[in-house]
Amino acid sequence: SYWGRPHDYLWLGTVHPSLVYQQMSLAYERGIQKMWILNVGDIKPAEYQVELFLDMAWNLEAVKQQGVAAHQRHFLEREFGKNRADRLQPVMQEAYRLAYIRKPEFMGNTRTEEKDPKFKVISDLPWSEQEINERLAAYRQLSDKVEQEWHALPAQKKETYFQLVKYPVQAAAQMNNKLLTAQLARHGKADWADSDRAYDSIVSLTKRYNTTKWNRMMDFQPRRLPVFNRVERKALSSGLPEKRQAVYTWNGADCAEGVSAICEGLGYEGKAVAVSKNKELTFEFTAWETDSVEVEVRLLPNHPVEGERLRFTISLDGSATEAVSYETKGRSEEWKENVLCNQAVRRMVLPVARKASHRLIFTALDEGVVLDQIYLYMPRIK
């Protein structure tokens, strides 16, 4: 959990297990091997991440050989049995992936500890109607699967399941439903009553949490921040943004050539890769219609490992850019945006020749570079 800028996340335990693994493995490799300290404040509902951290601290090599996905599956099998674990693991992996893109606590587009009062007001995320509906559908599918398992569970397992699976997945789904449906409703594209029903569902789920075995353990409104309230009804005359269509998209693992370490499950598509210093990844594409291309590079927004820099270059058909830096300073505006969306983004327009095929080469110039995605766009018309 976290208290502070740009926004708290004290409610649900959505820190991605693969991020815990990537960061702590990196720390161990860099010599932090004598003592790891875990601050256990709000343990519920972060039990799995706590167990993963402690297992890594006790025997990192064993977890490394097992892999994060297998470690999580073992956790679910221990609690719910083999067959149910087979069905639940994809559900939990997708729940972590969706929350990696945007945490439930960040869905109101608000911030904490800012002087400008606008950051206390629920406002639109920069997402198109298509992107909103796709995210709502993904959460709806997860919630339905969780509910199916709930009805099939033996009575002695229901409290554990509610705590570890049902509440965190369905509460996150309803938080997204509450705020994204409200965003659509502000533009006349959804019913405000659906947003209100999502809020009521969170209240009901939390009441269920706090009236049985886990009495008084869960608060769905930490610090009583605006994002946790019922959404105020208001109309906007402006339209929702259109989704910009990329011509080519790759995740880190899509490279045609190169050596990297896949960060199992990490990233917007679960395919981010760690690229060692001076190592290259090659991506190939075919004929391009214009004489230039806009390249958008999306990276894990981590801290520098050596010195104070995080840099890479992009080479298109042998013509390289200068070093591109993406490290940030804590509490800067860019740092806040990176935390909220879990990506550091750099864009550049490069010339492209008229030929049948092209090679785009990504080169890491520092240790600690993790590539998530690369998008190619037709340049914007000025």
Predicted ranges, named:
Residues 222-382:
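Extracytoplasmic
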